[in-house]
Amino acid sequence: ATATPKVMSDILKNLEITDAATFTTSFNRANLFYSVQPKTNVEKDMIRLLREHDGKSAIVYCLSRQKVEEIAQLLQLNGISSLPYHAGLDSGTRARHQDAFLQEDVNVIVATIAFGMGIDKPDVRLVIHHDIPKSLESYYQETGRAGRDGGEGVCVTYYSEKDIEKLDKFLARKPVAEQEIGRQLLQEARGYVLTATCRRHYLLHYFGEHYSPKNCGACDNCQGNPSDYDATKGARLILDTVLAGKDNFRTQQVVNTLIGLETAVLKTFGARDLEQWGAGKDQSDGYWTDLVRQ
């Protein structure tokens, strides 16, 4: 149901029906509001957000079972009725927690992606991603559990570059073919959270759908009235640093070179002797990381 143009083409090819007529409906969920927030005070932000939606059904997605348990406990301690759901729980517990959510005995379910497949609760008003999803397909499916009754749904994702690094290390343990596919999907998800353009436009374009309005009015970027910023000087510094590093520098090494933070890796490459060493120390490492990603 969330097939990209490439996936649809592969399906037709593998089923040997390449000349078949295809029918698609719009991927646009006009009643959903999309937002991405920096992962700084994520627990505090989530509690505030859930309290703003007090009494309404919400799903909080986390990538690990441990984080699911931690967040569920945190919410309970802060007076928010919630239960965990992940594959590490026995089937009886999972069934009880799922039923409690569907019957509205609890308002919030904190879950891994194990939750939601085949679940149709029409009045979910809030979907939070504590961690960046592994792909835009997963993101679309999971946010799509909000507002199925046609009512308003809010979808908030918290993003940190450290999450990307964790997922990248996890992929490194996979077979080479899976690594390549996984990293490509992860790059698309990263592109979505970092885009300064309309999130709805980005998402629909990924699924091969043309969305003409430049401003959807229902995402943080379109409502934020972003201002233009001339980043030419910074971009040139980044490119010069990459060239000076002779392809040895990854994002963190580029950033550390610009702010003048020596590490064992940079010492090996003699980064201190580069013209770019400390050239960007007037800006934070977060500024340079974001600019590199853009």
Residue spans of the language-model regions?
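Helicase motor core with emphasis on the C-terminal RecA-like subdomain
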Residues: 1-176, 181-184, 209-213, 220-221
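Alpha-helical scaffold segments in soluble metabolic enzymes
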Residues: 10, 45-48, 188-191, 202, ...
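Short helix-to-turn junction characteristic of helix-turn-helix DNA-binding domains
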Residues: 101, 193, 242-246
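Accessory DNA-binding and partner-docking regions appended to nucleic-acid-acting proteins
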Residues: 181-182, 212-294
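C-terminal accessory regions
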Residues: 184-210, 218
